[in-house]
Amino acid sequence: MLVKVSIHGQEYDLEVQPTDKIQEIKSKINELNGTPVEQIHPYIAGHAMKDGTTISDYPQIVEGSKIQVRVILKSQSDNSEKSEKSGKSEKDCILM
């Protein structure tokens, strides 16, 4: 089935199968625009799509559905302090 992927304000058409794992979807997105796989965080209807699941685990995904992608940039430095509440580096950044 064909779905839309929205990343950095651009939309791409992406062919997916119900048996495709989310890791495979991330790889396909990487092929579309070069974003590193580890920075790709797909969402459907506001819910994170988890690694280890497949497209069929998300019944709301049908032909023409839109998958939103958040790109989370991580600091390369192991010395950056992490926030107690979120556990994320203060240098983390989310791009949509």
Curated annotation (Swiss-Prot):
GO MF entries: protein tag activity; ubiquitin protein ligase binding
Residues passing through the membrane, by range: none
A Pfam family of this chain: ubiquitin
Chain spans, region Disordered: 75-96
Biological process according to GO: modification-dependent protein catabolic process; protein ubiquitination
CC terms in the record's Gene Ontology section: cytoplasm; nucleus
Domain of life of the source: Eukaryota
SMART domains: UBQ
Amino acid composition bias (Basic and acidic residues), ranges on this chain: 79-96
InterPro entries to which the protein is assigned, alphabetical: Ubiquitin-like_dom, Ubiquitin-like_domsf
S-S bonds: none
Entry similarity comment: Belongs to the ubiquitin family.
Protein name: Ubiquitin-like protein NEDD8-like protein 1
Organism: Dictyostelium discoideum (Social amoeba)
Lineage: Eukaryota, Amoebozoa, Evosea, Eumycetozoa, Dictyostelia
